[in-house]
């Protein structure tokens, strides 16, 4: 696989989602290199620690959900410097992956055993719309907390604001702490809302609205979407080796 092959794969995989969101903002490259790519590493975030792990595994190409954040001062500059020094290319894909049929929200829902997805995460007029899934049979809130904790490999925070069992689940992976999103879940009659970040306001509003709330980490609520993308890449280019560059549970 080379960079042209990869570009063609991304275009065919994401289609018009690439037109909906801005290149070099919501998806793009750091240090793109013309070379045959054999070893591909993947994870959620681009950080100096991730690049160091990639170097240790002789990775040539890193795929992440997030680019290095500009507001983490000097981090992106350091990442680009290390990518260049170690001759590693990097590709990130953010909102198109969030909204893809196989993307972050749907992949998390599938990971916790959801029976059917009834609403796809998407954007309308620049506003995010939550994903919704349903179980065929309701489960206890405590069982869902255990499922999410096991899937993410970390303790999660949970607020039981209703005694209802869980059948209908609303989710936005990553930074889904907006009260607007929680209100969507409430108005859709979801029994629980799952996300990857919280604030005082999200916790207070969920309690006021009487909707159960489960919060994992931003990083690990979103890794399943990246993994789904890389599995598709491996199916298209069987000669590549894929390596999970697992990050620290620090949130």
Where are these regions (language model features)?
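Active-site catalytic microenvironments in core metabolic enzymes, especially phosphate/sugar-handling
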Residues: 1-251
